[in-house]
Amino acid sequence: MKYTTAAEAVRLIQSHSSVYIQGSTSIPETLVRAMADRAGELTDVKVYSAFAVGTFDAPYCKPENRESFLVNSLFVANNIRRWLAEGYGQSIPAFLGEIPAMFRDGTLPVDVALLNLSQPNEEGYCSFGVSADLAVSAAECAHTLIGQINKAMPFSYGDAVIHISKLAAAVEVDDPLVEVPTAVPSDAERRIGSYIAEMIPDGATLQIGVGGIPNAVLAALKGHKHLGLHTEAMTDGVLPLIESGVIDNSQKSVMPGISVASLALGSRRLYDYMDYCKELVMKDVAWTNDPFRIRQNPKVMAINSAVEVDLTGQVCADSVGTRIISGVGGQHDFMYGGALSEGGKTFIAIPSTTPKGASKIKALLTPGAGVVTTRHMVQNIVTEYGVAQLRGRNLAERARALIDIAHPSVREELERAAAERYGYSFLRLKH
């Protein structure tokens, strides 16, 4: 391994090779820009881009570089959504927890991995810091590893370490990590959070995401006891519960006493908390998102969101019609693992309408919409109007329950659709 410049390091990338770019809040921007600067020298480089946040513009995905880089997105993030919609790349539909296996078995071969790493510790180990998720498996499988050694990256434990000698080239940087502002819940989101918190027992194990609704749920859990954390994404919202002892991980079966996550999305305060924190481990997403590992914890509470839900309980979470706007992430993994957990419950939490006023509960999904969580798996749908408990209910009963938590402006329309579809078995049901 040698320290060098970014321009020199990316000369290890060859035409017709495949490159994995670390994602989350950990895009190795210095290396990626240097790679894009070589567009005129490179042809047919397959790029695997992961979930990402922030304003980084993904120069490899732009039209002028279409002959140089072929973008395969493992999660359609904001920075590439426009270019993929215009045909300058494609998404790969896959459960996040299964992608590491695709790296490992060669389905998605990785020649080069571009990584954003912490400074090495005394033993020479660097940490993936805020983004173990796919980076662990990609680094394990790639023939060539190029790393940014970043002063701003926290050192996290778990699977998220690699010896600096494994790197073919390293570039020293001091690049601030992307910070995700803490979303302030709206009144509707606070009501949703309250409904969910009331259904969470003491001793539960939480899987929860980022945004207004997750923050509302977490804020409503201050009076709970002995909660655990086994989640895909670590956020600022859990810190008050950890600091107050509400989350103590004492009842977990998998890694008791320790919080488990695969990536982190938050503020510098969160990243500083993670630095050499022995009460937190960052794991390969194939490990965190394994439903059969998730189920081993007691009372798993899996809380996820959706783009839209139909009257049978089908959940679309990654597209608006045929237009892919995100990825499935770990929703399916945790909804399945949570359902299998003893005492577990799963939730799809959504405001009743979009910001533009369209109902998120529909008679039928928008044509072309992809189903992420099937109607056979969904348990509870929650809006600001209440909780529709779908587990064990027939289709007419599901329709009634979902209409009752839809926005009042669309309930009559939904009732007509349900009556036409289910006839007397729906009409006999009372509100």
Regions found by a protein language model. Give the residues of each.
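Conserved alpha/beta enzyme-core scaffold
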Residues: M1-H431
